[in-house]
């Protein structure tokens, strides 16, 4: 057996170790026969001072690191070692060996490198796809721009010639103005094919009902006609804020066809609103009374139809413009109040009752023809809201029954409409009357406990000086622990003597009186666990029917006579 080579080491920690958090400097006695390499010494320090098995410790002797694979003989007696807790992510290739040359690369570094490679690949693929899409768009724009240039009117060609002449003869300031105008016209031409492609996509996605009203051929208008239409719309629409918002929401980048269609819709909606306002005073009170008596809903104004068609025809309008239109329509609805019930279906005529929740006749309605101003067939005299919240989605029901199918009132996006305020009056007169007739009563019920049987008066029984014969019944008291584990004299208990030893004065008694209900074991009760998983509880307060006590431990023993049934009870 080799002699033990023990060395005394002074360990200095940067921070207190977990096992002894109050100190950072320690002395350690190490047997070098058990520690072959520095790793063994590190594991010993890790075990002694409560570090986890995954903690990376570094040993430094006079400022130099002791390599983990080096021999532990580097350490001599009374050396001072600095123990430093290394970071987990610093060593990329951590060499952990026990005498051999096996190396284990860090898993986290591998995962990070793998993630970086994946991110680079996805970025490259995304960039190449983006470039491909841009090339296709540029080629399509160039083709459409060339087609548009061939379709220019002769007056525009004359204008361009005059511009060229003025460029040759004009001053430098005029040349700058002409250049800026040319740039703006080029931008418009570039934007037009984009808007056309987007409009065609939106028309393909719409249902056949909407396609009938929106797939009409848009006439190409010259810039002069567009300017005239804009002037007419601005002069004719000063009174109504909703129509002004429509004319303002048509940006210059929108194509000429779209703007001309909007002007036609504006004039049609003006005529419709004028007709409605003529008939409104006669039917306002009747519509308001029907609204209060029957559960239904009203729409804010018929002018929202124009804004709905304009928003569905041009997807290029931003969400902020949509919200601006919606707020204007809501203000109009609040000021105008309840309109005529036949506002949306002006072509049918007749004013019927409001739409109740039980009517199953609403199977759908078609949007109006925006160019010709005629109404599609629909349920007569039915007030329908221009939009419900964010639009009726695919197959969503209106008013809990079979409702309007399809994609609903379309706004920007798929299945989204304008959030126009709708008034739902769901409380009927019968419900109000039922609530008024409800009567609340306060009643108190007295719950009486059952009458307890009267206790026997054992004081009339004869006292016993010695134990009676076997088989006799006695009444006695015992010194027991109460429920709060304090010693106290119990009440009278009835028992039957089973055996009696005259020498030791031990008595076996069978308790005849009822025992208290078993409770969960307390802190003074002993619980024994068996091998089969069962538990045996030894209560501090005795819970057994048969007890063995000394006769002198019985307090106030009395003999129960057979005629004790006639004992008076208190």
From Swiss-Prot:
The modification Phosphoserine is found at residues 171, 184, 245, 247, 253, 269, 486, 563. The atypical Tudor domain at the C-terminus contains two large unstructured loops, and does not bind methylated residues. The modification Phosphothreonine is found at residue 122. The lineage of its organism: Eukaryota, Metazoa, Chordata, Craniata, Vertebrata. There is a cross-link at residues 127, 151, 204, 209, 271, 278, 294, 493 (Glycyl lysine isopeptide (Lys-Gly) (interchain with G-Cter in SUMO2)). Residues 144-159 have a biased composition (Basic and acidic residues). Residues 389-417 are annotated as: Required for interaction with SMN. It is found in: Nucleus; Nucleus, Cajal body. It comes from Mus musculus (Mouse). The keyword Hydrolase does not apply. Residues 300-317 have a biased composition (Low complexity). Sequence repeats lie at residues 390-391, 394-395, 405-406, 407-408, 410-411, 412-413, 414-415, 416. The keyword Nucleus applies. GO terms for cellular component: Cajal body; female germ cell nucleus; nucleus. Symmetrical dimethylation of arginine residues within the RG repeat region enhances affinity for SMN, and thus localization of SMN complexes to CBs. This is Coilin. Residues 119-256, 282-325, 339-392 are annotated as: Disordered. Component of nuclear coiled bodies, also known as Cajal bodies or CBs, which are involved in the modification and assembly of nucleoplasmic snRNPs. Interacts with ANKS1B. Interacts with SMN1 (via Tudor domain). Interacts (via C-terminus) with AK6. Interacts with WRAP53/TCAB1. Interacts with HMBOX1. Interacts with PSME3; the interaction is inhibited by PSME3IP1. Interacts wit UBL5. Residues 199-217, 234-252 have a biased composition (Polar residues). One of its GO terms (molecular function) is disulfide oxidoreductase activity. Detectable in all tissues analyzed, with the highest levels in brain and testis. Keywords: Isopeptide bond, Nucleus, Phosphoprotein, Repeat, Ubl conjugation. Residues 390-416 are annotated as: 8 X 2 AA tandem repeats of R-G. Residues 457-556 form the Tudor domain.
């Amino acid at each position: 057996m080799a002699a033990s080579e023990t060395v005394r080491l002074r360990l200095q920690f940067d921070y207190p170790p977990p096992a002894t958090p109050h100190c950072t400097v320690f002395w350690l006695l190490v047997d070098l026969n058990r520690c072959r390499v520095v790793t063994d010494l590190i594991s010993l320090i890790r075990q002694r001072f409560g570090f986890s098995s995954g903690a990376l410790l570094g040993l430094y002797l006079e400022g130099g690191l002791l390599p983990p694979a080096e021999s532990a003989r580097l350490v001599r007696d009374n050396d001072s070692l600095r123990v430093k807790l290394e970071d987990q992510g610093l060593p990329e290739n951590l060499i952990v060996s026990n005498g051999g040359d096996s190396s284990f690369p860090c898993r986290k570094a591998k995962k990070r490198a793998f993630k970086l490679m994946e991110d680079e690949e996805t970025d490259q693929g995304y960039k190449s796809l983006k470039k491909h899409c841009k090339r296709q768009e540029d080629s399509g724009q160039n083709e459409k721009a060339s087609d548009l240039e061939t379709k220019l009117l002769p007056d525009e060609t004359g204008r361009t010639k005059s511009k060229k002449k003025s460029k040759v003869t004009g001053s430098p300031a005029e040349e700058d103005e002409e250049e800026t105008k040319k740039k703006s016209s080029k931008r418009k031409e570039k934007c037009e094919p984009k808007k056309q492609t987007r409009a065609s996509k939106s028309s393909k996605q719409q249902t056949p009902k909407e396609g009938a009203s929106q797939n009409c051929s848009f006439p190409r208008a010259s810039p002069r006609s567009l300017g005239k239409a804009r002037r007419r719309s601005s002069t004719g629409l000063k009174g109504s804020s909703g129509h002004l918002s429509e004319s303002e929401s048509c940006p210059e980048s929108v194509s000429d066809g779209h703007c001309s269609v909007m002007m036609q819709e504006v004039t049609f909606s003006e005529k419709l609103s004028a007709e409605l306002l003529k008939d409104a005073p006669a039917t306002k009170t009747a519509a308001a009374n029907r609204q209060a008596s029957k559960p239904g809903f009203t729409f804010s104004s018929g002018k929202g139809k124009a804004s709905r068609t304009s928003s569905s025809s041009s997807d290029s309008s931003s969400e902020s413009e949509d919200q601006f239109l919606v707020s204007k329509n809501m203000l109009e609805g609040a000021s105008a109040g309840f309109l005529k019930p036949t506002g949306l279906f002006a072509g049918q005529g007749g004013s019927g009752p409001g739409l109740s929740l039980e009517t199953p006749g609403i199977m759908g309605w078609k949007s109006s023809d925006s160019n010709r101003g005629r109404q599609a067939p629909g349920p007569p005299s039915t007030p329908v809201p221009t939009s419900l919240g964010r639009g009726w989605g695919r197959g969503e029901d209106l008013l809990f029954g079979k409702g309007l199918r399809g994609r609903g009132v379309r706004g920007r996006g798929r299945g989204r409409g304008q959030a126009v305020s709708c008034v739902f009056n769901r409380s009927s007169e019968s419900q109000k009357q039922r609530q008024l007739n409800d009567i609340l009563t306060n009643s108190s019920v007295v719950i009486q406990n059952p009458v307890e049987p009267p206790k026997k008066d054992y004081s009339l029984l004869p006292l016993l000086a010695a134990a009676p014969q076997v088989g006799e019944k006695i009444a006695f008291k015992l010194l027991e622990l109460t429920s709060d584990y304090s010693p106290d004299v119990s009440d009278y208990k009835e028992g039957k003597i089973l055996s009696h030893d005259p020498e030791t004065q031990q008595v076996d008694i069978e308790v005849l009186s009822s025992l208290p209900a078993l409770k969960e074991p307390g802190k003074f009760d002993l619980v024994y666990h068996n091998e089969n998983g069962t538990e045996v509880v030894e209560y501090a307060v005795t819970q057994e029917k048969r007890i063995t006590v000394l006769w002198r431990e019985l307090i106030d023993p009395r003999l129960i006579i057979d005629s004790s049934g006639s004992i008076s009870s208190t």
